[in-house]
């Protein structure tokens, strides 16, 4: 079974994907894993590669291609990433959501940052990503038609999600 898990920062995609992977006994690959692999292939650290990726949409496109290829090459796999559901063949496409303030609080705790700083960073990041996804891929992030299930992670603890 191929499962994609997507969602905005702070919704718990990485946590849920990891737990599901452990419980189902199938591998999990995140878009972040693919990004780190691509950086290593170029012998760059993550920060250097991130700066390059900001100016080069081909990197985002390659991440999506690689996740789609992984889905095609595996019978059982969990793919975690914001756009995984749009590019990978999957049996189940899951979107995790949570209220803005809940997400901000989770990120604030995880990254030991001031909540107001996190709120502003989220707003900037989400505007930027929505624009990039629209320009690069023609994807409207507010269109949820691609997903089979939408789960509000505010309603459950990570183990229950």
From Swiss-Prot:
Entries under InterPro entries matching the protein: Cyt_kin_arch, Cytidylate_kinase_dom, P-loop_NTPase
Keyword terms: ATP-binding, Cytoplasm, Kinase, Nucleotide-binding, Transferase
Species name: Methanothermobacter thermautotrophicus (strain ATCC 29096 / DSM 1053 / JCM 10044 / NBRC 100330 / Delta H)
Family recorded in the similarity comment: Belongs to the cytidylate kinase family. Type 2 subfamily.
Enzyme kind, highest EC tier: transferase
EC identifiers of the protein: 2.7.4.25
Subcellular localization: Cytoplasm
Recorded name of the encoding gene: cmk
Name of the protein in question: Cytidylate kinase
Keyword Phosphoprotein belongs to the record: no
